[in-house]
Amino acid sequence: MASKGGREKIKLVSTAETGHFYTTTKNKKTMPEKMSIIKFDPKARKHVEYKEAKLK
């Protein structure tokens, strides 16, 4: 049986205010700060910054 990992599920929310989001995981031990990444927003039809939010 596998042990519990240190990975946490997170939601990446678009800063273009379209309501679009991606879900992913991150290792909270090696990356304690909030994640920010540039990805494609299909609703805005361009690359925008996505910021980390809690996944409920």
Swiss-Prot record:
MF GO annotations: structural constituent of ribosome
UniProt-listed GO biological process terms: translation
Protein keywords: Ribonucleoprotein, Ribosomal protein
Source superkingdom: Bacteria
InterPro entries per record: Ribosomal_bL33, Ribosomal_bL33_CS, Ribosomal_bL33_sf, Ribosomal_zn-bd
One GO cellular component, as annotated: cytosolic large ribosomal subunit
A Pfam family: Ribosomal_L33
Family named by the database record: Belongs to the bacterial ribosomal protein bL33 family.
Protein name: Large ribosomal subunit protein bL33
Organism field: Acidovorax ebreus (strain TPSY)
Record gene name: rpmG
